[in-house]
A protein has these predicted regions:
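Generic structural detector for well-ordered beta-strands
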Residues: 11-15, 76, 103, 118
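Amphipathic alpha-helical segments that line or abut small-molecule/effector binding pockets
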Residues: 19-22, 146, 150
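Residue-level detector of flexible, active-site-proximal loop/helix-junction positions
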Residues: 38, 84, 120
């Protein structure tokens, strides 16, 4: 895989088991409780009409808001290792825009949770608005990662 255009990751120590943290990381419908941008979302139904559950290949529609702007973003689950790794890509594997990844590492006091963001390809909006949009999205991702990690920590430790 090629190097990302830009990337960022942060970690947080959580005083909870990997299983507890995993239950939050994989509950994408709850991301709106923690994210500074995402307000929730829903699993898309497969060809049999059954909503996804977070398996590799399942698709989730995230609902996002920034100021007055609201939009939906399709993501596809690309990696899932129970209590270890959960990753998805914005735009699905076809567009391969932004990779989001959560890695869980058990330790003596609980779990280290790392969230990573990697811009792989530019969206039409990023191309249209140029570097200013790219830098804005990167700053927004950093803010969202911090908020999400802190929110998940609070939820896991409560």
């Amino acid at each position: 895989m090629s190097e990302p255009i830009m990337s960022h990751s942060e970690s947080i120590e959580i005083n909870a088991s990997a299983e507890t943290v995993w239950s939050l990381v994989t509950d994408m419908e709850r991301y709106g409780e923690w994210s500074s941008e995402n307000t929730g979302g829903y699993w898309r139904k497969n060809e049999e009409g059954i909503p996804g559950t977070g398996a590799v290949g399942d698709e989730f529609v995230g609902i996002n808001r920034r100021g007055e702007d609201e939009w939906k973003a399709l993501v596809e689950i690309i990696d899932r290792k129970e209590n270890q790794t959960f990753a998805f890509v914005t735009g699905g594997t076809a567009m391969n825009l932004i990779h989001w990844r959560y890695d869980l590492e058990p330790n003596d006091s609980g779990t280290t949770l790392t969230e990573s963001w990697a811009l792989r390809n530019l969206s039409p909006l990023m191309i249209e608005n140029g570097d200013e949009e790219v830098q804005f999205r990167a700053a927004n991702a950093r803010e969202s990662i911090t908020a999400t990690l802190q929110g998940m920590k609070a939820a896991a430790e409560s």
